[in-house]
Amino acid sequence: MTPSLATKYVFTITARIDDVTSAGDIGHGTRRIIPIIGGEVHGEGIHGKVLPFGADFQIIRPDELIELEAKYALELDDGAVIYVENIGIRFGPKELLEKLKRNEPVDPALIYCRTTPRFETGHPKYRWLMRHLFIGSAARHADRVVIDVHQVL
């Protein structure tokens, strides 16, 4: 028998985003680039900001499934810098995805948006982030993405 899986909430990342740039149809979908321009991270023992660089490099596939690939960095209040690479997917009813594209509000419970963030840091206090797996539950808003990050125990 293998160990059972459980998760524990660890922190929330709120990444502010800027206007979408499209690279157009790349053969297997539409490539979109969404700049990450700042934000906050808050949780038990982790507080800081999202640094104002990085982006989410998305592909909207013909079946409307959205592949997410965000790369950015956090700077915590104690000076630690943590690189984040967050891979995921988002999908839902086509009409709701169209509303999101137009920056119209959509109830996050109606859109499936999950990610698998990975972290890198040389700061000894936060090296535990590199030794665990994490799952994110995310919600897209017009000006930000909110990700509740859970550690897989």
Cite the ranges covered by each PLM segment.
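Beta-strand-enriched cores of mature, soluble protein domains
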Residues: 1-153
